[in-house]
Amino acid sequence: MTMAVPSRARVYADVNSQRPREYWDYESYVVDWGNQEDYQLVRKLGRGKYSEVFEAINITNNEKCVVKILKPVKKKKIKREIKILENLRGGTNIITLQAVVKDPVSRTPALIFEHVNNTDFKQLYQTLSDYDIRYYLYELLKALDYCHSMGIMHRDVKPHNVMIDHDHRKLRLIDWGLAEFYHPGQDYNVRVASRYFKGPELLVDYQMYDYSLDMWSLGCMLASMIFRKEPFFHGHDNYDQLVRIAKVLGTEELFEYLDKYHIELDPRFNDILGRHSRKRWERFVHSENQHLVSPEALDFLDRLLRYDHYERYTAREAMDHPYFYPIVKEQGRMVSSNSPTPNALQGPISTTE
């Protein structure tokens, strides 16, 4: 077993080391429990592997909220999720944690969140226009750049964890249960993210990954949306998942990545990987999706779906890509139309112009 070559995030690598220990040391965190009686469950919204989610009413102010009742899981994991949510509170497009209480019956913790109209992206995102795809991905990138700048990787970016209130064009990144603090040189568990959104680093068991994992997942969402193919990489298990990726990005390119980081491939891949050439993105375009595809969309996609995590666009770089020019232009226009004009600040307009 050779040692894999270490890797370090291209951005925000040292943010946690520049903060006091309390910021990232979630195991020492002491939870401030709120009052459970303040919340009344209204209806069940869904259930996940680790929790059940309800719509509720905060009876102190009559406002709707969302209650996530956690299933029995290690205290450490619960503390991690709470600490991360506390650290990110108020961040752009990050779901707001309002309180943490104990369920009186089960004694399990329940997280109280702001209420978001419960359409997850999954139901919506195969029906969006070209402009809407750009708009919502830009909003999602704001959330990712924010959490990365705060030293946190989400590690479960997928449509199901992106809540959209389409009427108000509001987006929230939810479910921080797999999120983790980034410390350069640390080895992380590769059993994170959902199969179709797992980066190659997870599938080849490379543990020294970073924020760039989230950018692969975002790339999978983009591909799925512009090509109207859900999911884009449809593996039947984690091994097949890498094969599906290799059929698009190429096997030669995969081996270059493995060589660069001295990664040894699980022998189980020997019989299933085969040899595949890299495919051009254009080959996924057809009459049903061509209205969503543009040269800049394909260029942007190509900068996200890279084997080498170090080469992938960061969230900030992604936001500066020409794909988002129409959005940036529109958001700039809205900002300037809401602020006083320079003339209004300068008194009478001179007539010499």
Curated annotation (Swiss-Prot):
GO terms for molecular function: ATP binding; protein serine kinase activity; protein serine/threonine kinase activity. It comes from the Eukaryota. Keywords: ATP-binding, Kinase, Nucleotide-binding, Serine/threonine-protein kinase, Transferase, Wnt signaling pathway. The keyword Transferase applies. Pfam families: Pkinase. Its EC number is 2.7.11.1. One of its GO terms (biological process) is Wnt signaling pathway. Residues 334-353 are annotated as: Disordered. Residues 39-324 form the Protein kinase domain. It is an enzyme of class 2 (transferase). One of its GO terms (cellular component) is protein kinase CK2 complex. The active site is at D156. It catalyses: L-seryl-[protein] + ATP = O-phospho-L-seryl-[protein] + ADP + H(+); L-threonyl-[protein] + ATP = O-phospho-L-threonyl-[protein] + ADP + H(+). Coiled coil: none annotated. ATP binds at L45, G46, R47, G48, K49, Y50, S51, E52, V53, K68. The keyword Endoplasmic reticulum does not apply. InterPro entries: CK2_alpha, Kinase-like_dom_sf, Prot_kinase_dom, Protein_kinase_ATP_BS, Ser/Thr_kinase_AS. Belongs to the protein kinase superfamily. Ser/Thr protein kinase family. CK2 subfamily. Casein kinases are operationally defined by their preferential utilization of acidic proteins such as caseins as substrates. The alpha chain contains the catalytic site. May participate in Wnt signaling. Tetramer of two alpha and two beta chains. This is Casein kinase II subunit alpha.
